[in-house]
């Protein structure tokens, strides 16, 4: 039976509608391998604003957006043993893939798949945790399947790789704290040559473009001139790869359907968060409280942020 809840959502009432309309939403019951979460914080991703303003993905309107959730379990599905009501959790809401309203983040209560959710230690706030899911899932998708960069660095280091990355000079110390062994200025006119030189004598396991379009040609140039696997995963598709280099677009929701989701959210992340070996990143920029603040937060994200991710407290 459905939990006794009063749900509400920031609704996208029709294609390209602005602003979101905050009003009542259905109550949900978790099925097998699902949990119902009372959301305490949600984060904003670039895809949210582009879905609202450009309507490039097929959706059934009215609909709800959002993928990053941190909150408290209020009900578990019939076969769920890993979670209990009252548990603090962080998880990836995968409604963009399932097209189910209950699987989206911008509402008071969300259904999460158990293989896309992790227990959250009490010392990590909901707001700090909410920055993780989509970036983490996308990084895992790019690294282990055939705001992403922060997670890709940490996952790459955890998997035993030496990580080279690019950033603006003001963020050099930040990405080194995440585990990058060498950092290069992406504004430099010689950044590609500098990376190729630094990789001499090393075997490249692959590259991940966490920006898309503008960064893809440079990333491809570097791997094409280096020894090792000439493979680039990118968060945006449409790039025509040159001969000898494979470019594949990735999206985080795909890990819900294979062993990677469980490996990240069940086997790795809970222990890493508790031990402090994985840091929620980038830094949460809290833009408001309540579902009424979601539109302003999406608009703020669209203006651009550096080493920060826009979050709304609920």
From Swiss-Prot:
GO cellular component: cytosol
SUPFAM superfamilies for the chain: GroES-like (SSF50129), NAD(P)-binding Rossmann-fold domains (SSF51735)
Entry keyword set: Oxidoreductase, Stress response
Keyword Nucleus tagged: no
Single GO MF annotation: NADPH binding
PANTHER family: HYPOTHETICAL OXIDOREDUCTASE (EUROFUNG), ZINC-TYPE ALCOHOL DEHYDROGENASE-LIKE PROTEIN C2E1P3.01
Role according to the record: Involved in osmoadaptation.
UniProt similarity note: Belongs to the zinc-containing alcohol dehydrogenase family.
Protein name: Zinc-binding alcohol dehydrogenase domain-containing protein cipB
Source organism (scientific name): Emericella nidulans (strain FGSC A4 / ATCC 38163 / CBS 112.46 / NRRL 194 / M139) (Aspergillus nidulans)
Lineage, top ranks: Eukaryota, Fungi, Dikarya, Ascomycota, Pezizomycotina
